[in-house]
Amino acid sequence: MSIEKVSILGKESIHVGYGIQSHIVEETIKCLASSTYVIISDTNMSKTPTYEKLQDSFQKELAKQRPQSRLLTYLIPPGENHKNRETKAEVEDFLLQQGCTRDTVILAVGGGVIGDMIGFVAATFMRGVRVVQVPTTLLSMVDSSVGGKTAIDTELGKNFIGAFHQPEFVFCDVSFLQTLPKRQLINGMAEVVKTAAIWDETEFTRLEGFAKRFLAEISAPTPNLESIKDELIKTVLGSVRVKAFVVSADEKEGGLRNLLNFGHTIGHAIEAILTPEALHGECVSIGMIKEAELSRYLGILPPSAVARLSKCLAAYGLPISVDEKIFSKIIGAKKNNLKIDSLIKKMLIDKKNDGSKIRCVLLESIGKCYESKAHQIFKEDIQVVMTDEVFVHPFANRHPESVSITPPGSKSISNRALILAALGEGTTRIKNLLHSDDTKHMLDAVVLMKGATVSFEDSGDTVVVQGHGGKLFACKEEIYLGNAGTASRFLTAVAALVNSTQDEKSVTLTGNARMQERPIAALVDALTTNGSKVDYLNKQGSLPLKIEAGNGFKGGRIELAATTSSQYVSAILMCAPYAEKEVTLSLVGGKPISQLYIDMTIAMMKDFGVDVTKSETEEYTYHIPKAVYQNPQEYVVESDASSATYPLAFAALTNSSCTIPNIGSSSLQGDARFAVDVLKPMGCTVEQTSKSTTVTGPPIGTLKALPEIDMEPMTDAFLTASVVAAVSQGTTTISGIANQRVKECNRIKAMVDELAKFGVSADETEDGISIHGVQLKDLKTPGGRGVKTYDDHRVAMSFSLLAGLCKDPVLIQERSTTGKTWPGWWDVLHSKFNAKLEGHEYIRQRSGSLRNGDRSIVIIGMRAAGKTTLSRWLAEHLNFKLLDLDQYLEKKLAVDIKLLVKEKGWDYFREKETEVLNECLEKFGKGHILATGGGIVEGEKPREALKNYTKSGGIVLHLHRDLKETVNFLSKDPTRPAYSDDIEEVWKRREKWYHECSNYHFYSTHCTSEAEFANLKLVFAKFVSKITGDDTFVLPATRSTFVTLTYPDLRKVPSLIKDVSETSNAVELRVDLLANQETAYIAEQIGLLRSVATDLPILYTVRTKSQCGQYPDEDEEGMRKLLMFGLKMGVDIIDLQLISSPSTIAEVISKRGHTKIIASHHDFTGDLKWDNVEWKNKYAQGVSIDADFVKLVGMAKTFDDNLLLENFRRQNTEKPLIGINMGPQGKLSRVLNKVLTPVTHELITDKPIGVGQLSLKEINQALFQIGGLLEKEFWVVGFPVSHSRSPALHNAAYAALGLPYKFDIFETDDAEKVYTQLMQKPTFGGLAVTIPLKLDIKKYCTELSESAKLIGAVNTVTPIADGRKGFLGDNTDWIGIANSFKKADFALASGVTNGLVVGGGGTSRAAIFALHSLGCQKIYLLNRTESKLQDLVDSFPDYDLEILLEKNASSVSIGLVVSCVPGDKALDETLMKKLDGVLSNNKGDKQTRPLLLEAAYKPRVTPIMELAKEKYDWTVIPGVEMLVNQGEAQFKLHTGYTAPYKVIHSAVLNE
């Protein structure tokens, strides 16, 4: 057994080896005499063979060596969330109960959680007992176990309470690592890499070489760490020795020890937010990169060192960005919580800080820290590094007069050098290689295909490539290239040379979304013509590509169009020496694009030993011999000439000087001519030698435009030229840059669009751009979201220059895109040019949470699904124009569709239909309802267009109804072209397409009567308001409830649904309890529920068996689909179980649209008490995924469980909590819960037994009994009021809901009496105000609602904050009028309706307000005394009011009438004559159904009602309906509850 010992604080107490359990036992018992030894571990570790062996060995050895001593064991739950005060106290209580004394020795066997917390127990128990650390994870071996730092976590951060307490021994048994999962092993490597990065470059280099073997071994199906145990021991020792040395020099972290916190300032802040999903090492890895970038930003660390650190961490499988795909999946929706303000708050309370000053370790090079101490860092600098958007402040006069800048290596040369070196034989040292995203992808690809071995020297500045002579092999992994265009083209050709292996027969190249749009077809065609087999895996002509291995490169004559990209030409040139036959490459069809880059490739091939000869007989033709590249010993990459244009342009724009010391006239790069050919003619002074270039800008404002310049030799530099031209005098026209339209973006269009934001106009030309320069003083500061960079590095860098010339800071989006060619550009701008930068965090709104506004809505669905009718309703509701795409097509082609199909067939029709769809989406993108034909989804192209529309935030609404009804309808309709297939078969074929092409779905219930159609229109309008964001669920300020429906089929209980749900704030549909979970059935059930409970929000729940439901837990995919279908149905609230997979949670959260989310967790075992940390974790999880509510349900086994829950509720207030206990003993929790309490109803007979459900009435009664509800008094006031039905209405509702309230009569005409005798009472609850007090009471109201102000009368008074802040005067008369019309099927009225108000009194004002709210375009007024009407017209200047004259009475169109004249008095003859004319002219029929509401409720039938109904067949609404409806609204204002409508209606009618 080999054991390495490391000294710390003068004692060899750290022992490292493999399989040293017996040594641990012997050494502990021999050296640490004690009466009691206590092994403390966690429940996971205790199940491992290594732990069991350790415990057994200890027991046996102790019996031999110290038989009088005893061994105790204690296990705690695993995980960081148990590293807290509570768990520490439990351990201490155990030790005390066992009679442990000060001679106790504790062995902490476990990872960092055990080591930290048990070390802290040892530090404080009996004022300090001895502790032995036995770390069992790689992370704890190299980090937490060494150095004596012990601690527990608090809510404010990690390790905030602890002590320095040195262990007697630290035993690092590497064999323990065999028990760890892969992710935990990788997690530990972060601290290993960190230690080498701050202290030992030699060890760092060893780690770079070990990464591949390490990852391969731990990724094996059955890992065997013994095969790499020597390397693992070296790895642990390397870190432990550094830490031991540092701790010995600075035990209490006074200075030097702070260096060990590299990566932790930012890493700990990230971890505090992402724990427990993200592991410590993962967060520290990301922290290291961010702190390295901070060092680079401050001008301390070279870019190559950042690149090297990134590559090393990534090689071990560690995340280097929170945006990495796998890491993002792990942390799920918690990623949304990584706000810069939150992170900085966490950093501000870091233990390393000096007061409130943030301190951070800065890296100077790999293996060395800057000044060997932590430094104070400004929040502003951290903000720049941590955000991907930046404000560039005005350059003003902060910049230096002259500066020398060395840009990174040329991207073009770097990529070519890597390809040539990988294909070559021998070892070459490449210096000044560009360390960027592009070259990183290239290096990774070369290594994956085994084309070369890559290592680093000179702190990463030198890349050592050992080429394998063109021997490349297929690999299992996809080769991901991001948006690296150069790499994709070169590697496509290289992949054609790849050999197959026994297991792998192909290579797959892929990239990001933009890369998958960029063209590569011309190169692929050339390769396939030459024998390669290449398949497009997605879009034809773009990546991803699958290239079959083993076909090789045939060679011979290859022709490429001269107009093709020079990168295609270079790709074939570089691979040509490895063809089976010598290659002749001919560029045909004119002068080649970017000839200079072709010349560059040929020159570089010569540097690597292959001479390309130009044909003497054919123009633009090259002969390439068969050969193997011979790698030169050293190759120095020239700085990137395209990148050099930015600092040179800075000098031009700011009247300063800039020198590029390593690019001159001898450069191979076309862009090296930028200074001489572009900046010099614009007025700059240019000095250029063969190796250097210096530019001095003219006085500010004197740059001259270039009337015409051909930039074909330096196309990438046109963007830089454009921003200089923007502030030059005159118009600059650039040509020869057509290829820039197919780069990272359409750069010419991007330049035109973004220049416009600066007030600079520019025009696209056939092969270029014209820019009309402006005076500097006329340059505008872009507003809103600033400059869009299109994920294009050159767009970002170019506009960073123009931004600094504006008067105010300019926002640049996606600044990290510069990583493609110049990762440190912003650092140079900041540290070399002294530009002030300010990091900006863009808080993205929830996906779909923006209101739809005027964006057009597309309708799809089967023929006869109701698209025509519902589309018309939709257009009316949104005030959009309706465009039927079939009619548009008929008009465009001047032919009937039925005839078109008959003559030219369905295929032709589908083709034209697709053209029309694309045209209409482009042309009518705003303010339209685009109704499509049923078969629009038949073609792939229209499906793609519809899906893209939803991805861009547009609404595609799928309308559907019962299929049998559709079949019945179509079989009777001869006007439509006949289906060639059975209708049901057509539906089966299309169903999946409708679902994938739409983001919303509406199911129309079958209607057989006008009332049902009216209700459907109302339901549909509410649905549309929800999905467009105009009417979303808002939690009431008062107590709220939802009623649960557990019926398998709602069709059997429609009337019951309305009665049991109307007093709740939402209704829960338990999807898991439905008869089946087919989406068609669920849609039908939701359609029915909406038609019955019209006004109630729907809570959509799929509960699994483990969460007290019926849905199978194992069907995760089925659950995901059901949840996504709920979102598609536009439900108001969705229940999302916290036990769902992170991917399901993330998808639901990201696609929630306007639906609110309840994050739920149920424990029906009762094992989890409310003081258990697991509940806190579940609540925190709900908060972290940004749910709107968190619902936690326990099981009460004792009455005290309710009190524990209330304590939990008080402590957790970040999100509204629905917290209840199930069971009979949990009823109190339902009474005390205020937010969306689940309730049952007296009418529900089959209630679940033993759950403890209560009705709303029972909750209120119990709440009153325990003092949660107090008695209140309400009155109707006025004169006369003795016959008022208000007391009957309100008291009936109080009784139904169990409210301890009383409503009475107070008859008076004196408002002061009301105020002094009623409103001042402590039990005052509110008033119903009638004549003559509706005006007088206003002076006693502190506030008036908008309706009360406009109507000018108050009929409802409620106290504000129990009267302490005064009283609110409101008016519900208008609601009574409006709701009476709505309940009388007003929704069926088509188009805009005009209204008429009869009378000129106070109620008339409420009637006008109501009719306006219903959308009446014009409101006519009719009264015996016309002077009163003029007052009304003057009071509502914004409403279109018109006094109805006798001559017009018989001709105006009117659909709604409100009679506001006394019902018990004879009417004026003139008035009756006018009214008779109106009623006669607008007689009722099936289409119009005009409505008349009588405001007077005595007598029951008034003369006006009789006239309208009997003589002219108008639908009349008696006054009692208005009384009930306004009383219902009044009740809601008084109590916060919805009154049971049947109850109050009966109470009013039963006199």
From Swiss-Prot:
Record note on cofactor: Binds 2 Zn(2+) ions per subunit.
Residues noted as binding NAD(+) in the record, renumbered to the chain: 42-44, 80-83, 111-113, 116, 136-137, 158, 176-179, 187
Main location: cytoplasm
Chain spans, region Shikimate dehydrogenase: 1271-1551
Catalytic function, reaction form: 7-phospho-2-dehydro-3-deoxy-D-arabino-heptonate = 3-dehydroquinate + phosphate; 3-dehydroquinate = 3-dehydroshikimate + H2O; shikimate + NADP(+) = 3-dehydroshikimate + NADPH + H(+); shikimate + ATP = 3-phosphoshikimate + ADP + H(+)
Pfam short name (any one): SKI
Annotated spans, Shikimate kinase: 854-1044
Compartment(s): Cytoplasm
Enzyme Commission number(s) of this protein: 4.2.3.4, 2.5.1.19, 2.7.1.71, 4.2.1.10
UniProt KW Metal-binding keyword: yes
Region (3-dehydroquinate synthase): 1-379
Region called EPSP synthase, residue ranges: 392-835
Residues the record marks as active site: 253 (proton acceptor), 268 (proton acceptor), 1162 (proton acceptor), 1191 (schiff-base intermediate with substrate)
Keywords: Amino-acid biosynthesis, Aromatic amino acid biosynthesis, ATP-binding, Cytoplasm, Kinase, Lyase, Metal-binding, Multifunctional enzyme, NADP, Nucleotide-binding, Oxidoreductase, Transferase, Zinc
Pathway the protein contributes to: Metabolic intermediate biosynthesis; chorismate biosynthesis; chorismate from D-erythrose 4-phosphate and phosphoenolpyruvate: step 2/7; Metabolic intermediate biosynthesis; chorismate biosynthesis; chorismate from D-erythrose 4-phosphate and phosphoenolpyruvate: step 3/7; Metabolic intermediate biosynthesis; chorismate biosynthesis; chorismate from D-erythrose 4-phosphate and phosphoenolpyruvate: step 4/7; Metabolic intermediate biosynthesis; chorismate biosynthesis; chorismate from D-erythrose 4-phosphate and phosphoenolpyruvate: step 5/7
GO BP terms: amino acid biosynthetic process; aromatic amino acid family biosynthetic process; chorismate biosynthetic process
GO function terms (MF aspect): 3-dehydroquinate dehydratase activity; 3-dehydroquinate synthase activity; 3-phosphoshikimate 1-carboxyvinyltransferase activity; ATP binding; metal ion binding; shikimate 3-dehydrogenase (NADP+) activity; shikimate kinase activity
Record-linked SUPFAM superfamilies: Aldolase, Aminoacid dehydrogenase-like, N-terminal domain, Dehydroquinate synthase-like, EPT/RTPC-like, NAD(P)-binding Rossmann-fold domains, P-loop containing nucleoside triphosphate hydrolases
Residues that hold ATP according to the record: 861-868
Keyword match Transmembrane helix: no
GO cellular component, one term: cytoplasm
Functional description taken from the UniProt entry: The AROM polypeptide catalyzes 5 consecutive enzymatic reactions in prechorismate polyaromatic amino acid biosynthesis.
Oligomer and partners: Homodimer.
Protein name, entry field: Pentafunctional AROM polypeptide 2
Species annotation: Lodderomyces elongisporus (strain ATCC 11503 / CBS 2605 / JCM 1781 / NBRC 1676 / NRRL YB-4239) (Yeast)
